[in-house]
A protein has these predicted regions:
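N-terminal short secondary-structure element
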Residues: 1-36, 50, 65
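Short, structured secondary-structure boundary patches
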Residues: 2-3, 37, 44, 53-55, ...
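Alpha-helical linker/hinge and terminal dimerization helices associated
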Residues: 7, 43-44, 65-78
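Alpha-helix initiation/capping motif
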Residues: 12, 55-58, 65, 72
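Intrinsic disorder/low-complexity detector
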Residues: 20, 27, 57, 72-76
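A short LG(V/I)-centered, amphipathic sequence patch enriched
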Residues: 41-58, 63
């Protein structure tokens, strides 16, 4: 099941592009945020975040989910 919390966490991750800063923004621990994003990936059935040492990038699917979850903060490119 997809939760609003998971969508908020993905939106924060899209803004900050860093698990630690996104977690701080959401007032949760980094492991808690990471676990919820993984659960969201399982619920959707697709990878949403490319995890690299010291860096992350949202996949195309991740960007689309973030846009749908919070269209004011993540507008579609024109």
């Amino acid at each position: 099941m997809i939760t609003l919390r998971q969508l908020r966490y993905l939106s924060a991750l899209a803004r900050h592009r860093h698990f630690g800063r996104a977690a701080q923004d959401c007032a949760v621990t980094q492991p808690a945020l990471s676990m919820q994003v993984r659960e969201l990936e399982r619920a959707i059935g697709a990878e949403l975040v490319e995890r690299r040492p010291g860096d992350i990038a949202l996949t195309d699917t991740g960007l689309e989910v973030a846009r749908r979850a919070d269209p004011d903060r993540h507008p579609r490119p024109h």
